[in-house]
Amino acid sequence: VKDKLLRIAEEVYSAYRELPKDYDGHVKVGMGASGSPTSKIDRFAEEAVLELLDNENIKLSVLSEEAGFVDRGYKDVLVLDPIDGTLNCVRGIPFFSVSMAIGQKSMLDCEHALVRNLANGDIYYARRGGGAEMNGHRIAVSKYTRDESIFSLFMGPDAHPDTNKVRMHTSRVRSLGCASLEMCLVARGDAQAQYMNCTNFNRMIRVVDIAASSLILREAGGEVVDLETKGKLDLEFTLQDRKNFLAYGDIRLKELILSDSA
């Protein structure tokens, strides 16, 4: 399974790097199945994956941000975000990825996950019960100390006011625009928390965004919790399910941050 995910990620990575410098990837070419506008670069990457699955007879159905659910007749589902961080991609900010997980019904039953940074080629992979790795080396979360920690926060006009309370628990904040890679930073111990508390339902997180990175973080020793239920975050394999969440490496952050969240 890992080899299949690596093959798919390599297809997207190679196809992206072969694009001409004047490629107009920002152009909107329609509406995706999720209800969000589809950029030309999103559709390009998704079509590269779907074509590969067909050409190499890879036995997976697909749930993708743009195409929605593609029933190819298989129980195992590839949960795909062909370009996570589209705006970063089209603006030349080197922090965007292809994100893939394999499961059957929801995020919590995913067995394999792979996130590849399409700007520098870094590969994050996890198998349920098998730990997490970056570029073939095991990774693990790190301990929280206020003065040394970095929190990745969802910011802007749709950010819940509680975000400002959470910000006070760290001396450094980032908002990087690619949920999958931000969570991988927590998994590898270079950030200590990721917090998304959004007042606009249409901008909350979906399963295609973080199915892969959630398994990677959990296998690295961290956790992702639902801000509403305070329990483990789970998302059904549908584009209609959206949630706010906290991802952390150190268990002490769960109580510390959730106490600030309405």
How would you describe each model-predicted region?
Residues 1-83:
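N-terminal subdomain of lithium-sensitive/metallo-dependent phosphomonoesterases centered on the IMPase/IPPase/PAP
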Residues 9, 128-129, 140-262:
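An extended, acidic
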Residues 29-30, 37-38, 91, 174-175, ...:
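Short Gly/Pro-enriched turn/cap motifs at secondary-structure boundaries
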Residues 42, 53, 86, 117, ...:
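Residue-level signal for inorganic ion chemistry
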Residues 49, 53, 98, 102, ...:
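Buried hydrophobic packing segments
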Residues 61-65, 89, 174-177, 226:
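General beta-strand structural signal in soluble alpha/beta enzymes
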Residues 74-129:
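DPxDG-like acidic metal-binding loop motif
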